[in-house]
């Protein structure tokens, strides 16, 4: 579980501004649930989703997401993890493979979100990508209310990762404009669906 509290180059929660915000958000909170809710709602509501705003600033490191107040779903998950880990709440990274037809026809890509370890409930998934018409992600454990319901040919990656996927980090660091990003969203091999089914079939 300690690996879900680690600081990394991307989850750089020793940054002074992240530390300050993490402390402010946890003020007067009595439980990890209260802290997690405040951190989640801050990132969801106060950091622009780069795709929704067609922002040409692509961020990756948590401190940059906070500095520029913008990020794709992946980057927003990096900031949320930093705020929670700074408050000693284990946090991991989760992904879905979704249709990205709102940006380009007939493409699929990874969507990034978080899993938070809550003392009362265990792992709980949240999606801080930002709400808009048709998207209403909430924090109400143990009920998970994510941004998107899975449709045909979409799936969850079953793992909870300690660090962001390398393909996600590489994409965010390489492509900097809105147009570059929508033409190069991070994705995985379709064979992943077969692995997912194998893992599911092997569950006790």
Q: Which ranges hold each PLM region?
A:
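Hydrophobic/aromatic-rich core segments of domains that either
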Residues: 41, 75-165
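Detector for Asparagine
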Residues: 9, 15, 24, 46-48, ...
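Intrinsically disordered, low-complexity segments enriched in small/polar residues
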Residues: 40, 72, 93, 173-176
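Charge-rich, low-complexity amphipathic helices
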Residues: 44, 61-65, 69, 102-106, ...
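Secondary-structure boundary elements
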Residues: 1-68
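Hydrophobic/aromatic-rich structural module bridging two neighboring secondary-structure elements via a short loop
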Residues: 64-65, 72-78
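A structured, mid-to-C-terminal "fold-capping" secondary-structure block
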Residues: 136-204
């Amino acid at each position: 579980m300690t690996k879900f509290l680690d600081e990394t180059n991307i989850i750089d929660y020793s940054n002074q501004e992240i530390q300050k915000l993490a402390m402010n958000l946890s003020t007067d909170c009595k439980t990890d649930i209260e802290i997690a809710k405040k951190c989640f709602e801050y990132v969801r509501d106060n950091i622009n989703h780069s795709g929704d705003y067609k922002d040409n600033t692509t961020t990756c490191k948590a401190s940059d997401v906070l500095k520029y107040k913008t990020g794709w779903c992946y980057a927003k998950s990096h900031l949320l993890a930093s705020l929670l880990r700074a408050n000693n709440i284990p946090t991991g990274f989760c992904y879905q493979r979704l249709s990205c037809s709102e940006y380009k026809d007939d493409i699929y890509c990874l969507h990034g979100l978080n899993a938070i370890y809550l003392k009362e409930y265990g792992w709980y998934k949240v999606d801080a990508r930002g709400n808009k018409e048709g998207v209403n992600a909430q924090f109400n454990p143990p009920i998970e209310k994510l941004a998107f319901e899975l449709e045909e040919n979409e799936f969850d990656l079953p793992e909870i990762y300690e660090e962001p996927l390398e393909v996600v980090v590489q994409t965010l660091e390489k492509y900097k404009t809105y147009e570059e990003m929508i033409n190069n969203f991070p994705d995985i091999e379709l064979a992943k669906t077969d692995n997912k089914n194998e893992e599911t079939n092997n569950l006790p």
